[in-house]
């Protein structure tokens, strides 16, 4: 959607994460999460337009939606490692609509320290849409940019990788064809997340 511009290659970013959120020295909350985005640019800056962010934990979902406009949904996630095999699933309404699996291989030649940019739209639906002069919203629709600063301690290839999409009326990712996997990796380390408002969208 404008003002984002589709990337020259139709590529999709899929991430599964098992996150330990250090809310205070005494309190750490662990959640599972996934992010799916489409490659795009904003004023020449590469990133991904976020299609969905299913994750565990109501407070995490509400906070991300209200602050950054992230399209988060409450979901069940499963992430397990057995030997050198990795399997991750996202489940909503009893359907494992997104699944990833692979075998942990050798060190990847990808970067361990970098910043990723993702784009979202933050908007407040109007309580009186029939009277709205702004397309059914109260106030401006804002394009936001998420800035994820990665600092990995380990980055390894995932061999024999698969991404499995299943039919779900509420989560229709299966409509996106998986033609080939360009790169799949297993990372350990830390991420510092933040964001900013880029512009109002008329």
Language model: regions and residue ranges:
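Homeobox/homeodomain signature
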Residues: 4-6, 64, 69, 153, ...
